[in-house]
């Protein structure tokens, strides 16, 4: 298992970023890499609240972690500090033992020149997930988050 850290500046205040992190309709739009679509099945945005999300590859290829062309994960919100931090525990729904195990996902918001520096740390990522893929997917999601909050096309 390993840890990744990805950050990005967003031209929006921490309050707006925090709200977008916890809005299931917004999550379906931004928390997904390019080339995939997102479906939020369950989303209880409170400490201890559960969520379940599926990402689906748009093309014909793309081996999913949970099934053909699909990555489904579930988890719960461990800590919610308004306008500062969201901590989640996440697990892939998979039959592959190499992809199993809980990951901790911490998103930290730091005020930065009228905007927000968003830092995403994944801890406990299974070794079967290439680190470059995890980092690239997180970077793409943060690009979509910025586009959504800044009111510009992706």
Question: Where do the model's predicted regions map?
Answer:
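Hydrophobic ligand-binding cavity/cleft-lining segments
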Residues: 1-38
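A generic structural signal for beta-strand entry/edge sites
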Residues: 1-3, 50, 83-85, 113-117
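Short, surface-exposed coil-to-beta transition loops
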Residues: 5, 38, 70-74, 100-105
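Structural motif
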Residues: 11-13, 80-82, 112-114
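Hydrophobic pocket/interface hotspot
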Residues: 17-18, 27, 51, 77, ...
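Glycine-rich portal/gate segments that line the openings of hydrophobic small-molecule binding cavities
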Residues: 39-89
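Short, highly charged C-terminal tails/helix-capping segments
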Residues: 40, 148-154
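Beta-strand/loop substructures that line and gate deep hydrophobic ligand-binding cavities in soluble
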Residues: 78, 87-139
